[in-house]
């Protein structure tokens, strides 16, 4: 396949949006996933089949079929942004597009591979793939307003895929969908109250958009309840804590590092993330056996230490020193981050029946 840089040069000469080089993979960038398709196909849905069938019926209605239609508000909107705001906004669009496209690829492949053996599950994944493709295409089109786009075909063929067992897919995608809901709805509500901070018309679409994320999260909630072992027992409690911490820490460190984007929207990145983390943690108690104690004063103190360590790691990378010297400079900060994450993981969690007794 032709590398994206070569395509970019051809695109510039033809007046089309340039194809943007994918960002380098790091611990903070969206990942592409694959799983054990045979195990997924063999899943017995009977413990919660009624709820899954009801969710599938909701998917069939495709409430947002006509929602993602660009209008005249997009005309010239990109030209109104200053260079720095353009830069951080394009970064946001790229990260969001990559994340949505990652979901599309996983759901589409699942729907295709399990269709014969588990048609209900396959249909649900097909509907979610439809939604994710729609989101990714809409975001990529918005990037085109700024003169660049992602080559999604190139990403499909060249991105590294991480293998997760099905239950890990459940934890990771459930949290991704639910945290996506709270991120989008928080931005939408803030901009409704502060319209002068609405830097681009794509935010007008976030209210309906986030309902897709919410429905997808509800599907994984129902699927985990159909596989009770995924949310029962000591092992499940430990894995739920791990994924909650991994998702929350990754988001917090990433968003603080690109706080300029949130400042452009009139938001404080730290306060925004604290709100999203609190709401996602609360929502997760509906299905996870335990959640994190995010109100403990040490929780954000330790995350801030990780932010500081990551800044030091970035400075080491940019120092111009030789590779061995950079490695030696970075080792203490990697170790410090590992220690802080271990302290966060082993902090006492909150049992979900105590957190949301009425719901559970």
Swiss-Prot record:
Belongs to the AcsF family. InterPro entries: AcsF, Ferritin-like, Ferritin-like_SF, Rr_diiron-bd_dom. Gene3D superfamilies: 1.20.1260.10. GO terms for molecular function: iron ion binding; magnesium-protoporphyrin IX monomethyl ester (oxidative) cyclase activity. The keyword Nuclease does not apply. Keywords: Chlorophyll biosynthesis, Iron, Metal-binding, NADP, Oxidoreductase, Photosynthesis. Its EC number is 1.14.13.81. Its cofactor is Fe cation. The gene is acsF. Pathway: Porphyrin-containing compound metabolism; chlorophyll biosynthesis (light-independent). GO terms for biological process: light-independent chlorophyll biosynthetic process; photosynthesis. The keyword Translocase does not apply. Coiled coil: none annotated. It catalyses: Mg-protoporphyrin IX 13-monomethyl ester + 3 NADPH + 3 O2 + 2 H(+) = 3,8-divinyl protochlorophyllide a + 3 NADP(+) + 5 H2O. Catalyzes the formation of the isocyclic ring in chlorophyll biosynthesis. Mediates the cyclase reaction, which results in the formation of divinylprotochlorophyllide (Pchlide) characteristic of all chlorophylls from magnesium-protoporphyrin IX 13-monomethyl ester (MgPMME). HAMAP family: AcsF. It comes from Synechococcus sp. (strain RCC307). This is Magnesium-protoporphyrin IX monomethyl ester [oxidative] cyclase. CDD domains: ACSF (cd01047). Residues 1-20 are annotated as: Disordered.
């Amino acid at each position: 396949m032709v590398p994206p840089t070569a395509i970019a040069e051809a695109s510039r000469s033809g007046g089309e949006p340039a194809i943007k080089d994918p960002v380098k993979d790091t611990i903070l960038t969206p990942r592409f996933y694959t799983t054990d398709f045979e195990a997924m196909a063999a899943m017995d849905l009977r413990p919660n089949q009624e709820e899954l069938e009801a969710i599938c019926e909701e998917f069939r209605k495709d409430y947002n079929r006509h929602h993602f239609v660009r209008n005249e508000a997009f005309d010239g909107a990109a030209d109104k942004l200053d260079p720095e705001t353009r830069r951080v906004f394009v970064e946001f669009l790229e990260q969001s597009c990559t994340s949505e496209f990652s979901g599309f690829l996983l759901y589409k492949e699942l729907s295709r591979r399990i269709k014969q053996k588990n048609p209900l599950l396959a249909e649900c994944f097909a509907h979610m793939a439809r939604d994710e493709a729609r989101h990714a295409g809409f975001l990529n089109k918005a990037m085109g307003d700024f003169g660049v786009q992602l080559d999604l075909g190139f990403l499909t063929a060249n991105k590294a895929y991480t293998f997760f067992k099905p239950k890990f897919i459940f934890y990771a995608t459930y949290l991704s969908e639910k945290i996506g809901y709270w991120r989008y709805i928080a931005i939408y509500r803030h901009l409704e109250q502060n319209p002068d901070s609405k830097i681009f018309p794509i935010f007008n679409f976030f209210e309906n958009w986030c309902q897709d994320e919410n429905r997808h999260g509800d599907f994984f909630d129902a699927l985990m309840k159909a596989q009770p072992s995924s949310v029962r027992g000591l092992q499940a409690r430990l894995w739920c804590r791990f994924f909650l911490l991994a998702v929350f820490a990754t988001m917090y460190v990433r968003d603080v590092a690109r706080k300029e984007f949130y400042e452009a929207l009139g938001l404080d990145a730290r306060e925004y993330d604290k709100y999203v983390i609190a709401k996602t943690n609360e929502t997760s108690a509906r299905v996870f056996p335990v959640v994190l104690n995010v109100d403990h004063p040490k929780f954000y103190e330790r995350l801030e230490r990780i932010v500081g360590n990551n800044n030091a790691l970035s400075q080491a990378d940019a120092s111009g020193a030789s590779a061995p010297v950079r490695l030696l400079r970075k080792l203490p900060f990697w170790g410090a981050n590992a220690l802080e994450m271990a302290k966060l993981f082993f902090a006492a969690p909150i049992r979900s029946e105590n957190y949301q007794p009425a719901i559970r």
